[in-house]
Amino acid sequence: MAYAVVRIRGSVGVRGSIADTLKMLRLHKVNHCVIIPNTETYNGMINKAKDFITYGEIDKDTLIKMILKRGRLSGNRRIDQETVKELMGMSVEELAEKIVNEEILLKDTPIKPVFRLHPPRKGHNKAGIKKSFTVGGALGYRGEKISELLKKMI
């Protein structure tokens, strides 16, 4: 199952090693999202940057909405059903299914690997962006509930 990783906190006061990890994850700005496979290497990177990001397993429907609404090609061109069919030879639904099941990596497609999202409508959780999701905040692992956050941000 692929992870959706969203950067929540900014760059002020970030240690150098964590800043490098966020760069390797391609999370240069707040509210940027990447889809990564569930591998040991990426899990280590996520664990290191857990105080600046939130992550969880993305579902197919949310990924389809993200690709169609926020996905971009080179030159900042928008994506639609016909474009994906023409470039990839498959529908958006098939592409999303393969990305979620880690058969294809998003970076191996012509789609840009970073989704630039809005801040969440109605805000983050009540405890804010400095506390873990388990205690009511916005940071760290949130499992399947990442889809709720992404739907607020699309």
From Swiss-Prot:
Gene3D superfamilies: 1.10.15.30, Ribosomal protein L30, ferredoxin-like fold domain. GO terms for cellular component: cytosolic large ribosomal subunit. One of its GO terms (molecular function) is RNA binding. GO terms for biological process: maturation of LSU-rRNA from tricistronic rRNA transcript (SSU-rRNA, 5.8S rRNA, LSU-rRNA); translation. It comes from the Archaea. The keyword Ribonucleoprotein applies. InterPro entries: Ribo_uL30_ferredoxin-like_sf, Ribosomal_uL30, Ribosomal_uL30_arc, Ribosomal_uL30_CS, Ribosomal_uL30_euk_arc, Ribosomal_uL30_ferredoxin-like. Keywords: Ribonucleoprotein, Ribosomal protein. It holds the Pfam family Ribosomal_L30. CDD domains: Ribosomal_L7_archeal_euk. Belongs to the universal ribosomal protein uL30 family. Part of the 50S ribosomal subunit. HAMAP family: Ribosomal_uL30_A. This is Large ribosomal subunit protein uL30. It comes from Methanococcus aeolicus (strain ATCC BAA-1280 / DSM 17508 / OCM 812 / Nankai-3). The gene is rpl30.
